[in-house]
Amino acid sequence: MTIAIGQNQERGLFDLVDDWLKRDRFVFVGWSGILLFPTAYLAAGGWFTGTTFVTSWYTHGLASSYLEGCNFLTAAVSTPANSMGHSLLLLWGPEAQGDFTRWCQIGGLWAFIALHGAFGLIGFCLRQFEIARLVGIRPYNAIAFSGPIAVFVSVFLLYPLGQASWFFAPSFGVAAIFRFLLFLQGFHNWTLNPFHMMGVAGILGGALLCAIHGATVENTLFEDGDAANTFRAFTPTQSEETYSMVTANRFWSQIFGVAFSNKRWLHFFMLFVPVAGLWTSSIGIVGLALNLRAYDFVSQELRAAEDPEFETFYTKNILLNEGIRSWMAAQDQPHENFVFPEEVLPRGNAL
């Protein structure tokens, strides 16, 4: 008889922590959860706190909290004052010096939410990578989620970094985001930017593809149930497919003359279109951060200036942009003491 004598391998601290993090529980934690849960919790908590109690009087001269009479659509956590520049506005930093009230007044909550929100989104993306690896599937969900991360980082961080201060980023609120959109249009003519056009095409195209795909699958289910919905006929363990790709292909071939014949290509296309839209719009925002111009049809502007009877939709929009700038610059940045001479104020029959 042979007796094998061996030592149990000692499990280090890393192995113990790894086992605990990956334990099967109702809400999976994982290594990504160390980044995701604290940052997401703090970002959400900061936003609820700011919209409930914190004023924007000292940064924008506005009321922005429920305490001041705002509602869900008008409440916001506003960006720091322009004088703060690109400071991280740490609570213990030279601006607030540990004073929480002063920190809120100068816009510290916005920097807090923006930075923790960015890390929270990155943590959620890493969570999808981690779970995909543990389950044994490919990480396309995480790759797709890179689109929202790119948009958040470009709009809330990179754009104001290219401008004078965090002041020019969007505030965290519904009406505040709308104001930021008007700002982008007035100061950058954003709607005529080709990267914005590609972004719109990607997002709306993705919504259209989603609707078409869902309707087509519902139309070609192999077996319909006798209940009020179609889920009764589906079982998670069935070996056959739920709907007929062949029938769907024939249907769209008759309508368009061409149709997807391969499920992999079809679903990759549905992944690619909206993600490409998000990424291209993010690239466009980085261009705006650097004050790059897109389409300026100067010849039309010159002709419209010389000929009062010549006007295009482009020249009308340029006049609208001038109006936005003349109002928003003085209204939003009173500390700059902007004074606009009469010749730059909106004019012409477009307004």
From Swiss-Prot:
Entry similarity comment: Belongs to the reaction center PufL/M/PsbA/D family.
Membrane topology term: Multi-pass membrane protein
Keyword Chaperone set for record: no
Residues that bind chlorophyll a ChlzD2: H116
Protein name: Photosystem II D2 protein
Catalytically driven reaction(s): 2 a plastoquinone + 4 hnu + 2 H2O = 2 a plastoquinol + O2
Top-rank lineage group of the source organism: Eukaryota
EC number(s) reported in the record: 1.10.3.9
Sites where the protein binds a plastoquinone: H213, F260
Signal sequence extent: none
Enzyme class label: oxidoreductase
Name of the gene this protein is made from: psbD
Subcellular location: Plastid, Chloroplast thylakoid membrane
GO cellular component: a single term: photosystem II
InterPro entries the UniProt entry points to: D1/D2, Photo_II_D1/D2_sf, Photo_RC_L/M, Photo_RC_L/M_CS, PSII_PsbD/D2
Main location group: plastid
Role description: Photosystem II (PSII) is a light-driven water:plastoquinone oxidoreductase that uses light energy to abstract electrons from H(2)O, generating O(2) and a proton gradient subsequently used for ATP formation. It consists of a core antenna complex that captures photons, and an electron transfer chain that converts photonic excitation into a charge separation. The D1/D2 (PsbA/PsbD) reaction center heterodimer binds P680, the primary electron donor of PSII as well as several subsequent electron acceptors. D2 is needed for assembly of a stable PSII complex.
Binding site for chlorophyll a PD2: H196
Keyword DNA repair tagged: no
A Pfam family that the UniProt record links to this protein: Photo_RC
Assembly notes: PSII is composed of 1 copy each of membrane proteins PsbA, PsbB, PsbC, PsbD, PsbE, PsbF, PsbH, PsbI, PsbJ, PsbK, PsbL, PsbM, PsbT, PsbX, PsbY, PsbZ, Psb30/Ycf12, at least 3 peripheral proteins of the oxygen-evolving complex and a large number of cofactors. It forms dimeric complexes.
Residues that hold pheophytin a according to the record: Q128, N141
Record's keyword terms, sorted: Chlorophyll, Chloroplast, Chromophore, Electron transport, Iron, Magnesium, Membrane, Metal-binding, Oxidoreductase, Photosynthesis, Photosystem II, Plastid, Thylakoid, Transmembrane, Transmembrane helix, Transport
